[in-house]
Amino acid sequence: MRIASFNVENMFDRAKALNGANWAEGRPALEAHKELNTLFEKPTYSAANKAKMLSLLQANGLSKSDEGPLLRLRKIRGNFIKRPRVGPPEIVATGRADWIGWIELKTEAVNEVATQNTARVIAAVNADILAVVEAEDRTTLRLFNEQVVGETIFNAVQASPYRHVMVVDGNDDRGIDVGLLSREGLPIVSIRSHVDDADANGVIFSRDCAEYEVRLPSGQSLWVLVNHFKSKGYGAASANDAKRLRQAKRVREIYDEHLAAGEDWVVVLGDLNDIPGNQPLAPLLQNGSTLRDIAQHPNYRDSDNRPGTHGNCTASGKLDYILLSPVLFGKVSAAGIERRGMWGGVNGTLWPHFDEVTKAEEAASDHAALWAELDL
């Protein structure tokens, strides 16, 4: 049985602020999106609050219109802003109770060839159980599975769509949720979301740690914990690190709870957004954890001899993981990485890629897909 993880970076539509050449390009809009929505929730708007709102709106092209290049001001009811023909705009709402609305990220269609190349990666990996990161929603993933994966020809063989498709909406409103696809005979028999898990500092997961129980033909349950940890893309590095550490601690607790219950067929996988030696991932990779990284398995093969999974796949780009409980790690017969859907460097010369990837915009993703073959 083959298990895989792939950050698809959306299939059909993606937030424009996330779709630039690099993180820095969309960072101001992403930060404004978060800060404005936080300010909007205040019961009373102080003069300083209003000044900050106006400053952020102007910086993002929203002082004269509800439509900016990357953001949209969505107003449902009540009065929020006055935009006179002469003179500066003015925030007329005195607090949250005066109006209903928010800032949303504008989306754009993903390059059609890139969408097809995403399906080529999935067909090439040909996993029995596939964890996906950054899926828009279940409907989109289902349609992608049926209409794109199911129509893909890879190595002259028609790719087969998955029988079971599931996404649970997480805490991120940018359409970058985690999900699972599985083949016929591998039903998803239970789902547990952790979107509401909290500690003393608040909600833990930026998206979710979605737990899927997959029933194997033998009757054995395989527990698959799909994750997408806090990114390094924007915000203070110290705060981001602290958030990922909290997330890793909670995933470790969930994993240990399964082991304590005698459920020792557990997979933790996804985009953890940090490298192995850094403190945020210590609860999963150190600190007495029994989880094992498939990249450390003697049967793991990487023909490109590059340590990373993201960007140019240097050591600082090892962000994606398949972590296995000891029982499962002992059943690994093969493991590897699929980079042919990535571009690779400025000129796309760092590794071989599909013929259909002729430029960076046609890449399936900035992430490689990881896979592990297990004798189950």
Segments and roles (model prediction):
Residues A114, T118, D137-T140, R244-Q247, ...:
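Stable alpha-helical elements in mature extracytoplasmic
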Residues M1-A159, V167-G170, D355, E362:
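N-terminal, active-site-proximal structural segment of metallo-dependent hydrolase catalytic domains
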Residues P217-Q220, L225-D241:
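Active-site His/acidic residue clusters
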Residues V8, A135, F229, D271-L272, ...:
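Active-site metal-binding loops of divalent metal-dependent hydrolases
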Residues R2-A4, A15, R192-F205, E213, ...:
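Metal-dependent phosphoester-hydrolase catalytic domains
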Residues D137-T139, D172-D177, K232-Y234, N273-Q279, ...:
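Active-site environment of divalent metal-dependent phosphoester hydrolases
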